[in-house]
Amino acid sequence: AANRFPQRMILSHRTKIAGVIGWPISHSKSPKVHGFWLNKYKIDGIYHALSVSPNRLSQALKGIAALGFRGVNLTIPHKVEAMALCDKIDETAKRIGAVNTVTICKDGLLSGTNSDAYGFIENLYNQSSWTASLGPAVILGAGGAARAVAVALSDAGVGQIRIINRTRERAEALIVDTKIKNAVTESWKSVSYTHLRAHET
């Protein structure tokens, strides 16, 4: 009789283990995306979704190194906090002030980088209708991903970047930390739907 149960992946000591850490994590499409490419290229690997609360992030990163993970991606709300937990940070992550990828070095040290800026701006460049001269850009939020987007837009030559966050102090800190000179903050309460549509990119 045909096996009614799906065949499970058989893991071995050679299986490459990676994942994504977030809180919550149910929204992440990363496991499906990475799983697709692992399967397509017949890579002996597995990619987990890992639900980790902010107060357990340090333990989690130490744990993945001990368990033989190759590395992890980071999503909300860990990108900024993970900076202080990495042993090494590359220049891109330092400038953005957040990491979205942590790899485990052969010596067990944690190395942080950030690919959000590159991924975001490359997607815009692939849109034939987009140019940096279209007008002001509006960023909602001031977390790790917003930092990367702000840096990418500034480097691309966008004339003005307007950062809107529930707490204005955090938006101002983003500008100071990333040293972006063409960015301003606006109050969340002062922005209407019409305003956002007018500046949509």
Where are these regions (language model features)?
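Glycine-rich adenosine-cofactor-binding loop
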Residues: 22, 114, 134-154
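Phosphate/diphosphate ligand-binding glycine-rich loop within oxidoreductases
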Residues: 12-129
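Short acidic-hydrophobic, aromatic-tinged amphipathic segments that line or gate anion-handling sites
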Residues: 184-188
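Conserved small/polar residues in nucleotide/adenosyl-binding loops
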Residues: 194-201
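Conserved S-adenosyl-L-methionine
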Residues: 155-160
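NAD(P)-binding Rossmann-fold cofactor-contacting core
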Residues: 161-177
